[in-house]
Amino acid sequence: MPPKVSSKGAKKAGKAKAARSGDKKRKRRRKESYSIYIYKVLKQVHPDTGVSSKAMSIMNSFVNDIFERIAAEASRLAHYNKRSTITSREIQTAVRLLLPGELAKHAVSEGTKAVTKYTSSK
């Protein structure tokens, strides 16, 4: 009686044959994240501190969440004012509405600084 081949083994063998016959490797889709930027900021603030992959994942989720909230609020503001374009003014107002007190002031000043730097480099 021949030995039984598990279904996993059969699948793996099938994939290997397909890869050899066509020589087409499927490229893995790149997963975009803010991790390199978060890491750069961490090194500016605390050069001797590291970050775990779990903490980096949490920070990445946080940045995505804040980004979505600001974009949604800016979109709402543009709609209220019958505008079809989200400008830096809508973003600034959205930040003021979403972030509390001192944090909003710092965010607005950093954002203004970044926009000024960008426009002067053009």
UniProtKB/Swiss-Prot annotation:
Pfam family, one: Histone
Positions of crosslink type Glycyl lysine isopeptide (Lys-Gly) (interchain with G-Cter in ubiquitin): 117
Keyword list, A-Z: Chromosome, DNA-binding, Glycoprotein, Isopeptide bond, Nucleosome core, Nucleus, Ubl conjugation
Residues carrying a glycan: 109
Entries under CDD domains matching the protein: HFD_H2B (cd22910)
InterPro entries: Histone-fold, Histone_H2A/H2B/H3, Histone_H2B, HISTONE_H2B_site
Principal location class: nucleus
Subcellular location: Nucleus; Chromosome
CC per GO annotation: nucleosome; nucleus
Sequence segments annotated as region (Disordered): 1-31
Post-translational modification: Monoubiquitination of Lys-117 gives a specific tag for epigenetic transcriptional activation and is also prerequisite for histone H3 'Lys-4' and 'Lys-79' methylation.
A GO molecular function held by the record: structural constituent of chromatin
Composition bias, Basic residues: 9-31
Signal peptide: none
Gene3D superfamilies: Histone, subunit A
UniProt subunit comment: The nucleosome is a histone octamer containing two molecules each of H2A, H2B, H3 and H4 assembled in one H3-H4 heterotetramer and two H2A-H2B heterodimers. The octamer wraps approximately 147 bp of DNA.
Stated role: Core component of nucleosome. Nucleosomes wrap and compact DNA into chromatin, limiting DNA accessibility to the cellular machineries which require DNA as a template. Histones thereby play a central role in transcription regulation, DNA repair, DNA replication and chromosomal stability. DNA accessibility is regulated via a complex set of post-translational modifications of histones, also called histone code, and nucleosome remodeling.
Family: Belongs to the histone H2B family.
Name of protein: Histone H2B, gonadal
Species name: Patella granatina (Sandpaper limpet)
Organism classification: Eukaryota, Metazoa, Spiralia, Lophotrochozoa, Mollusca
